[in-house]
Amino acid sequence: MLEELLNGNIEKKTITQIYGPPGVGKTNICIISMLKAIENGKNVVYIDTEGSLSIERIKQLSGKDCDELLKNIIIYEPSSFEEQSEALEKIFLLENVGLIIIDGIVSLYRLELCDKINENTKLNRMLGKQISNLLKVSRQKNSGILITNQVKDSINGIEPAGGRLLEYWSKSIIKIEKSESIRKLTLEKHRHAKEGENLRFKILQNGLEIINKSYQ
């Protein structure tokens, strides 16, 4: 799916970010990308911060024995932003990691934001450290990074949550939208592929159906 838009696989040693509102298909794209990495003989780390990952959905999209696939998937389900940091640190000890996925990178971060400046400063430092560790471990393992992100309101409509930090360190940024049963991916930022290209697709029970690719 993403290789159609990026004109190649998810780039290694950099962050690819997909952002959009809830229910548009971000997790489905993560699962498809995960299965692609496993097909290439790699293990995948999946950090699920929102409880979105479904074993049944993995089975539907793969059409294979899920028990066998799960041997290649290391799943973490942190319940706090600190636990998310701890999960990232564990990746340094793993072998043959081809892809690191964080589904909902700032979900726990946003839940813990409060009116106390000191606490928010601590959270911001933790987010910066997580990005640093992500990039460090991806370079060590020669792996790709795929993160999903929520949205927030802005003057121009919606924009990714997480501020300038995530925007700066994400070398690929993809927006996902939904209109009835049709989803649209738009490439907003990339070092090599053509920015502005978009891909329309449908989510089916057993996969994703590409409708067309165009430039806007």
From Swiss-Prot:
Q: Which InterPro entries match?
A: AAA+_ATPase, DNA_recomb/repair_Rad51_C, DNA_repair_and_recomb_RadB, P-loop_NTPase, RecA_ATP-bd
Keywords assigned by UniProt, alphabetized:
ATP-binding, DNA damage, DNA recombination, DNA-binding, Nucleotide-binding
Q: Which domain of life is it from?
A: Archaea
Please provide, alphabetically and separated by semicolons, the GO molecular function terms listed in this UniProt record: ATP binding; ATP hydrolysis activity; ATP-dependent DNA damage sensor activity; damaged DNA binding
Q: What PROSITE patterns does UniProt report for this protein, alphabetically?
A: RECA_2 (PS50162)
Q: Which GO terms describe its biological process?
A: DNA recombination; DNA repair
What family is it from? Belongs to the eukaryotic RecA-like protein family. RadB subfamily.
What is this protein's function per UniProt?
Answer: Involved in DNA repair and in homologous recombination. May regulate the cleavage reactions of the branch-structured DNA. Has a very weak ATPase activity that is not stimulated by DNA. Binds DNA but does not promote DNA strands exchange.
Protein name, please?
DNA repair and recombination protein RadB
Question: Which organism is this protein's natural source?
Answer: Methanococcus maripaludis (strain DSM 14266 / JCM 13030 / NBRC 101832 / S2 / LL)
